[in-house]
């Protein structure tokens, strides 16, 4: 197990390194000069002053040297300073934003797992019934709906028209922190984030349950007179969860992409909104730092997903 963990960790580090190189190259290919982010458009600067500022920031060095310098600082935990917020470090900005994003993703995935697994089991147990057809149609709609469209529609219906949920933010301005207020702001973004993932989980769960229900050991349990409830819970559910665990692990990356759109629509103060603002203002250190942290989180979750196999099914050995 330890050897497997080290092997996957090394692969993850390689993927993370490749990701940072790709983002660095793409940023260099974008039009414009990074030095423009430092210059006040209302203040005239001579070419000599701009060259001096470029040299001070290290932007006059070759690109490989710039990347290696950034990577060396990143390994030590120093991701640099924001170009737009001169007194704030990138690490500090990420630390203040990663909590809301993790909260949103955890709530959204929890809702998706509960809804997806429950409806998938019901559809499989009651195959070709009205609930099965209904859940299948809803799952198809959920899979087909883009995250940004679902977010805008949810915001319009539940916030603008029905007034059931706040229109944005994480807390009500000028009020003390309270759990009920946080949950009111969290409910709609988390529900919107969960729709597509719940639909995918439902489809996978239904297919896996149908396959498992036709196994010989399930027929044997039924022949022995075991109640259908215990056949599903004790003999079927655990084995049927294996492909679903794979899907849940892979949806973490999709949830990051969905969270970026949802945070921008609902003005949720998380990593997605930070990354969008950094792209709009060409804040390169923030873009690189946020990408590094998001990529690391996705890779760690994928490793934990692989290790979860051995917990769910002890017959599976990791090597």
From Swiss-Prot:
The keyword Cytoplasm does not apply. Coiled coil: none annotated. One of its GO terms (cellular component) is plasma membrane. Keywords: Cell inner membrane, Cell membrane, Membrane, Peptide transport, Protein transport, Transmembrane, Transmembrane helix, Transport. Residues 98-305 form the ABC transmembrane type-1 domain. The chain crosses the membrane at residues 9-29, 102-122, 138-158, 182-202, 242-262, 284-304. One of its GO terms (biological process) is transmembrane transport. Gene3D superfamilies: MetI-like (1.10.3720.10). Its main location: membrane. It is found in: Cell inner membrane. It comes from the Bacteria. It is a multi-pass membrane protein. Belongs to the binding-protein-dependent transport system permease family. The complex is composed of two ATP-binding proteins (BOV_A0347 and BOV_A0348), two transmembrane proteins (BOV_A0350 and BOV_A0351) and a solute-binding protein (BOV_A0352). Probably part of an ABC transporter complex that could be involved in peptide import. Probably responsible for the translocation of the substrate across the membrane. This is Putative peptide permease protein BOV_A0351. It comes from Brucella ovis (strain ATCC 25840 / 63/290 / NCTC 10512).
């Amino acid at each position: 197990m330890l050897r497997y963990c080290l092997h996957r960790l090394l692969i993850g580090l390689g993927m993370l390194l490749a990701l940072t190189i790709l983002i660095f190259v793409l940023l260099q290919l974008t039009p414009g000069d990074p030095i423009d982010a430092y210059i006040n458009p209302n203040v005239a600067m001579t070419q000599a002053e701009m060259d001096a500022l470029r040299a001070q920031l290290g932007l006059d060095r070759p690109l490989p040297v710039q990347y290696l310098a950034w990577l060396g600082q990143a390994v030590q935990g120093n991701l640099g300073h924001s170009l737009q917020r001169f007194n704030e470090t990138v690490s500090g900005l990420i630390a203040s934003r990663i909590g809301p994003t993790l909260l949103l993703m955890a709530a959204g995935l929890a809702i998706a797992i509960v809804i997806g697994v429950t409806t998938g089991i019901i559809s499989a147990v009651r195959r070709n019934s009205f609930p099965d057809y209904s859940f299948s149609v809803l799952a198809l709609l959920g899979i087909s709906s883009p995250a940004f469209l679902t977010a805008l529609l949810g915001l319009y219906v539940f916030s603008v028209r029905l007034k059931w949920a706040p229109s944005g933010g994480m807390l009500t301005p000028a009020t003390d922190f309270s759990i009920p207020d946080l949950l009111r702001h969290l409910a709609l973004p988390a529900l919107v984030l969960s729709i597509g993932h719940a639909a995918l989980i439902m489809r996978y769960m239904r297919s896996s349950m149908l396959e498992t229900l036709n196994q010989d050991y399930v027929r044997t349990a039924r022949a022995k007179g075991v109640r259908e409830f215990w056949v599903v819970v004790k003999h079927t559910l655990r084995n049927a969860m294996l492909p679903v665990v794979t899907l849940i692990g892979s949806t973490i990356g999709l949830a990051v992409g969905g969270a970026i759109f949802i945070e921008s629509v609902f003005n949720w103060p998380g990593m997605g909104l930070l990354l969008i603002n950094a792209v709009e203002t060409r804040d390169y250190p923030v873009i690189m730092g946020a990408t590094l942290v998001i990529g690391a989180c996705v890779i760690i979750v994928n490793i934990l997903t692989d290790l979860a196999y051995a917990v769910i099914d002890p017959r599976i050995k990791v090597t």
